[in-house]
């Protein structure tokens, strides 16, 4: 294979977990959080979930400070909200160019180092849990890599570019925590619902060189993130009519645990990141006017960091996104407290 250079064999997930293990106390903390989060998706709890954090987790110190502040907000809103830090360590790139995340580049200004990356992502997710008591969310960009973090993640997202992929769907069917399926960039919600259907059913397939059986994931659910029309324009899909339509399509499909997370950024905001608080509040307004919508909406995804906006790699502004722009901490704190007040 002349076009592919096999540089070195990486440790398998079992080896990485043995080298960087979870303590029994952290494993129990994670399990307790898993139960609380599952109760939201099954309807046993009426709390809302906020999957919130930077577009990309680019440096450990800033992410840990952000999550420490988030833990303080969790204490203030514990009766209303469950906060799940968004610690995204691998990033899909539309053209294949640009920063691909901590997994690829533990140092954004250096070349890729996948061995160091595997260690870095496990260390970061572990440290967030150990330092703050908050278990984390990440995107499943590469299904084969999920096992490196399977004992740590409280929430898994499948992105708009991956949601039609069979390997993502089948792997999601073997995950024991909620997996959110985003609508594709075309906006076709039938694709998203078919992905949820596949993830909720058992399968047999090849995974990491093994023949595996899965039991299905009843916590697989929908994420609306807006879409792009044929003219390249961003079209939102969080308005009342779209939410009612999704509920009806969801119910007609006969899926378990009808549930939706609304992504307040991406095409829903046309990447105008300051719109995220307004979008969350509009969805909450819709919840007050429809019992169907209220029962379906389980929370939001918000892109947020210590500093608002974004920067180019190499500018070295601490706590500011090097990928998509995010709201800063003051706006984050206000949004979280406002949501808790409104529900």
Whereabouts are the PLM-identified features?
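Short acidic, Gly/Ser-rich segments with clustered Asp/Glu that frequently serve as metal-coordination loops
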Residues: 55-58, 257, 265-271
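N- or domain-start disorder-to-order transition segments that initiate the globular core
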Residues: 1-44
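Conserved phosphate/anionic-ligand binding catalytic regions in large, soluble enzymes, centered on
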Residues: 49-62, 324
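Internal helix-turn-beta structural module
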Residues: 305-343
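Active-site-facing alpha/beta catalytic cores
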Residues: 8, 67, 80-245, 266-271, ...
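Conserved, mostly hydrophobic/aromatic
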Residues: 53, 262, 328
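Glycine-rich phosphate/diphosphate-binding loops that line cofactor/substrate pockets in enzymes
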Residues: 38-46, 251-257
């Amino acid at each position: 294979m002349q076009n592919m250079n096999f540089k070195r064999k990486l440790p398998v997930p079992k080896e990485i977990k043995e080298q960087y293990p979870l303590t029994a106390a952290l494993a129990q903390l994670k399990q307790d959080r898993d139960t609380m989060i599952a109760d939201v998706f099954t309807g046993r709890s009426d709390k809302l979930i906020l999957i919130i954090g930077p577009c990309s987790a680019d440096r450990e110190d800033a992410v840990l400070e952000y999550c420490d502040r988030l833990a303080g907000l969790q204490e203030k809103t514990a009766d209303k909200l469950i906060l799940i830090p968004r610690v995204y360590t691998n990033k899909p790139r539309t053209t294949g160019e640009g920063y691909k995340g901590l997994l690829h580049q533990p140092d954004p200004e250096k070349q890729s180092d996948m061995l160091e990356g595997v260690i870095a992502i496990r260390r970061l997710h572990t440290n967030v849990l150990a330092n703050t008591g908050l278990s984390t969310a990440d995107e499943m960009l590469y299904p084969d890599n999920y096992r490196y973090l399977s004992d740590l993640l409280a929430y898994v997202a499948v992105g708009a570019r991956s949601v039609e992929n069979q390997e993502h769907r089948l792997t999601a069917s073997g995950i024991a925590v909620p997996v959110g399926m985003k609508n594709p960039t075309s906006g076709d919600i039938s694709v998203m619902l078919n992905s949820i259907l596949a993830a909720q059913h058992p399968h047999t397939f090849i995974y990491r060189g093994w023949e595996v059986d899965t039991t299905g994931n009843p916590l697989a659910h929908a994420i609306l993130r807006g879409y792009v029309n044929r003219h390249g324009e961003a079209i939102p899909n969080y308005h009342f009519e779209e939410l009612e339509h999704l509920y009806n399509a969801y119910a007609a499909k006969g899926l378990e645990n009808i549930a939706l997370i609304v992504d307040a950024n991406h095409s829903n905001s046309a990447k105008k990141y300051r719109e995220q608080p307004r979008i969350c509040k509009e969805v909450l307004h819709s919840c007050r006017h429809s019992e169907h919508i209220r029962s379906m909406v389980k929370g939001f995804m918000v892109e947020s960091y210590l500093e608002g906006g974004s920067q180019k790699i190499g500018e070295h502004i601490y706590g500011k996104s090097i990928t998509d722009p995010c709201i800063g901490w003051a706006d984050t704190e206000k949004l979280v407290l406002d949501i808790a007040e409104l529900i």
